[in-house]
Amino acid sequence: MSKDVSKEWFAGAKKDLEVAENLFRSKFYSHCLFFCHLSLEKALKAIVVKVTKTHPPFSHDLRKLADIGGVSANQKIKEFLDTASTFN
């Protein structure tokens, strides 16, 4: 798996975060939450690709993706990822 795949996932995450910011400014809060989740998911999948050198799993579970990518997270962050996963 090339670094380009990881970079593509991360570029998508950045674009989705921009969309989320625009939705927030427009007061489309539920749509904003969805794109925040999507941005986090893509960023975590970029990490998974970089660390495992394989395609990321077909999953929207942010904590699972963080675990697979070896992301160190305390309990508060894990709870945040669990909550954010409900916005998908």
Enumerate the predicted regions with their spans:
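Terminal alpha-helical segments
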Residues: M1-N88
